[in-house]
């Protein structure tokens, strides 16, 4: 009897027309993860990006052909072209594909195709998607369920942000930034929270954003499941409109899975989760922050619905090795002035930055908190300006890099100079580092014994922290600009 391949098992027969799939912007975390899964399923993968990265190197090892730079010739063999929302319609590869009548689909459409014949678990929300997705994937793996997962960050235990499993479970982030999560039709949907972000997608209307989340839940079958954080005011307000089975989680006494008794010691936290039947689990998570304990509570709710054993859940949380750029601990360094701890975090929304600051304060209360922050997008800085000023005022020393534009045009009054002025009006003394090449020397001037340096943001600051770590945080090397 012929053995069915993963490709035959989880795709429509009509997908036989597709042999070569080209990704424009293949180095992105979400794009690269999907490309990696499709490569494993036997498709020929090509792609382009502006530079080599760890992601493109991994894809090349998986058999993908990666072009550096965008050119119309890159798509000449493609049967379908996949693009992310970050790619402009004027990209020569998109123009060439359309001229050749080659289908051009968004990243989420291809993810939806991967999910079509699998048991999909989609995690949406303004914050916490990557961590929650990673925790669910880790629990399922610990329970022996061997899931496929596609995550927007590097899962340290897997050494990758994507993996093809042998079961029919597919665990993936659902992208609300461009509303493309509406393409997905999962069996389980998680909403971690809903706050104003990416408002240009929703015409500046929170009501339109709410309607879109309702539509996302309506993509579940009537026998599916929505797992919703009841602590999120907007998300909980929408529950009566969902019309699907709902499980809630959070700190509220009304939650179906209630998180309580939170405590943190350095890089780990402990908490208890109790369901409506009075059954409790006391878990230790190898990750700091109450926000991460809440993410873990969501993962527990999903796992319990799948009847995963408590010991597998607790083991997965305790062994969790973290995710790249989510409170990533680079180490504690000894330099000419004493001890310096270096941590990097991806958070770029005021609520995310606040949660990271809280985790740092609770885990290391005796340390002075020095933040190097890179704002991400002018529109976000404009829309959430006062919230940014409020949260950035909470650190002991702030070094503010210029806004990472992500392709946007500058907006007057929504830049780092303006943020510095507003912070000075609050009695703070931020330092504006207009040239990132000067960051090392400016940081050297600021450092004291027992500092916790937190690099924060979604732009290229994730590369800068690696070069800072490479100096061992030596004052002499930092002053010499050896980054």
Swiss-Prot record:
Uppermost EC category: ligase
MF terms in GO: ATP binding; UDP-N-acetylmuramate-L-alanine ligase activity
Pfam families linked to this entry: Mur_ligase (PF01225), Mur_ligase_C (PF02875), Mur_ligase_M (PF08245)
SUPFAM superfamilies: MurCD N-terminal domain, MurD-like peptide ligases, catalytic domain, MurD-like peptide ligases, peptide-binding domain
Reactions mediated catalytically: UDP-N-acetyl-alpha-D-muramate + L-alanine + ATP = UDP-N-acetyl-alpha-D-muramoyl-L-alanine + ADP + phosphate + H(+)
Compartments reported by the entry: Cytoplasm
Main location per the UniProt record: cytoplasm
GO biological process: cell division; cell wall organization; peptidoglycan biosynthetic process; regulation of cell shape
Lineage top rank: taxon: Bacteria
Pathway per the UniProt entry: Cell wall biogenesis; peptidoglycan biosynthesis
Annotated PANTHER family: UDP-N-ACETYLMURAMATE--L-ALANINE LIGASE, UDP-N-ACETYLMURAMATE--L-ALANINE LIGASE-RELATED
Family note: Belongs to the MurCDEF family.
Protein name: UDP-N-acetylmuramate--L-alanine ligase
UniProt source species: Pseudoalteromonas translucida (strain TAC 125)
Protein encoded by which gene: murC
């Amino acid at each position: 009897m012929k053995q069915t391949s993963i490709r035959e098992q989880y795709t429509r027969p009509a997908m036989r027309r597709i042999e070569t799939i080209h990704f424009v912007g293949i180095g992105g975390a979400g794009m690269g993860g999907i490309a990696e899964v499709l490569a494993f399923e036997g498709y020929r993968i090509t792609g382009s990006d502006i530079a080599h990265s760890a992601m493109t190197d991994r894809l090349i090892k998986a058999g993908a052909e990666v072009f550096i730079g965008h050119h119309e010739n890159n798509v000449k063999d493609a049967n379908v072209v996949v693009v992310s929302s970050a790619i402009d319609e004027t990209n020569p590869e998109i123009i060439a594909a359309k001229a050749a009548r080659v289908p051009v689909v968004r990243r989420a459409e291809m993810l939806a195709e991967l999910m079509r014949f699998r048991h999909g678990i989609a995690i949406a929300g303004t914050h916490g998607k990557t961590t929650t997705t990673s925790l669910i994937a880790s629990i399922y793996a610990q329970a022996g369920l061997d899931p496929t997962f596609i995550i927007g960050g590097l899962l340290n235990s897997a050494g990758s942000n994507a993996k093809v499993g042998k079961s029919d479970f597919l665990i993936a982030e659902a992208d609300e930034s461009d509303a493309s999560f509406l393409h997905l039709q999962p069996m389980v949907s998680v909403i971690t929270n809903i706050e104003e972000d990416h408002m240009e997608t929703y015409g500046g209307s929170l009501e339109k954003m709410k309607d879109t989340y309702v539509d996302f839940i309506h993509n579940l079958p009537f026998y599916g499941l929505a797992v919703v954080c009841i602590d999120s005011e907007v998300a909980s307000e929408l529950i009566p409109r969902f019309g699907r089975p709902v499980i809630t989680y959070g700190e509220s006494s009304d939650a179906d899975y209630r998180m309580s008794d939170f405590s943190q010691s350095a890089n780990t936290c402990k908490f208890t989760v109790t369901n409506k039947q009075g059954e409790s689990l006391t878990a230790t998570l190898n990750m700091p922050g109450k926000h991460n304990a809440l993410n873990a509570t969501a993962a527990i709710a999903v796992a319990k619905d799948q009847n995963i054993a408590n010991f597998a859940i607790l083991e997965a949380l305790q062994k969790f090795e973290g995710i790249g750029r989510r409170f990533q601990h680079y180490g504690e360094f000894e330099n000419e002035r004493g001890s310096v701890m270096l941590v990097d975090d991806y958070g770029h929304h005021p609520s995310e930055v606040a949660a990271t600051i809280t985790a740092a304060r609770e885990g290391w209360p005796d340390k002075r908190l020095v933040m190097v922050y890179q704002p991400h997008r002018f529109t976000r800085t404009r829309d959430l300006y006062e919230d940014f000023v409020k949260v950035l005022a909470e650190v002991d020393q702030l070094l503010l890099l210029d806004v990472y534009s992500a392709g946007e045009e500058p907006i007057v009054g929504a830049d780092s100079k303006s943020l510095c002025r507003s912070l000075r009006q609050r009695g703070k003394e931020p330092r504006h580092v207009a040239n990132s090449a000067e960051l090392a020397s400016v940081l050297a001037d600021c450092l004291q014994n027992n500092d916790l340096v937190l690099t924060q943001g979604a732009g290229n600051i994730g590369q800068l922290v690696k070069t800072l770590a490479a100096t061992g945080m030596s004052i002499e090397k930092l002053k010499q600009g050896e980054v």
